[in-house]
Regions:
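A conserved amphipathic helix/loop scaffold
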Residues: 8-9, 13-19, 25-186
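Short helix-loop-beta junction
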Residues: 1-6
Length: 186
């Protein structure tokens, strides 16, 4: 499987935020950064060797609200323009792969929702992530029909009906089936 975690933009000033993080997928579709300073930390992380995958067309109506990127002397059409500029790219780079320091910026000019709403678009997204993972980690992504998340004493597991295989997931120990109204211990 692939180790996945959420990174909150507001936490970028803390060094621990990027600890162990190799690839970061981000978008400003319908959500915008509260402060331009966050881009300093993102750009620094990429420069040191991180891979940033930016997904977005930057055309949603929230680009035009009066915010830091278009007030107080800033003349950016979208906050991403400031981020790209920080990484020595053009303000509006086309879809492609770019180097910045020891790191890489991959721009996918697609609104993230279209990866699931347009038939076949998920494959392009997956292949981009898989390629970045292979480049950075040196391993192929192992696709499975199940998810397992462990947090402390809790294990959350699910098997997908529509997936790469019909292989059952086997776990040892005692578990409660939350999808059964009687909550049996298995």
């Amino acid at each position: 499987g692939i180790p996945v975690e959420l990174v909150h933009m507001e936490n970028t000033p803390f060094k621990e935020t990027f600890k162990g993080l190799h690839i970061l997928v981000m978008s400003y579709s319908n959500m915008k950064p509260m402060k331009l300073e966050y881009h300093n930390y993102l750009a620094d992380w990429v420069k040191k060797g991180g891979i940033l995958i930016y997904c977005g067309e930057d055309i949603d109506p929230y680009q035009t609200v009066l915010e830091w990127w278009n007030t107080d002397g800033n003349e950016y059409k979208a906050p991403s323009e400031h981020l790209f500029e920080k990484m020595n790219l053009s303000r509006n780079p086309g879809e492609g792969t770019y180097r910045y320091g020891k790191g890489t910026v991959i721009v996918m000019r697609e609104d993230p929702k279209h990866f699931v709403l347009k038939a076949g678009n998920d494959q392009k997204y997956f292949e981009t992530i898989a390629s970045a993972y292979q480049k950075k980690i040196g391993k192929e992504i192992e696709t499975k029909n199940s998810f397992i998340v462990e947090r402390g004493p809790y294990t959350i597991a699910a098997v997908m009906d529509e997936s790469v295989s019909k292989e059952p997931l086997t776990l040892s120990g005692l578990y409660i089936d939350l999808f059964d109204k009687d909550l049996p211990v298995l």
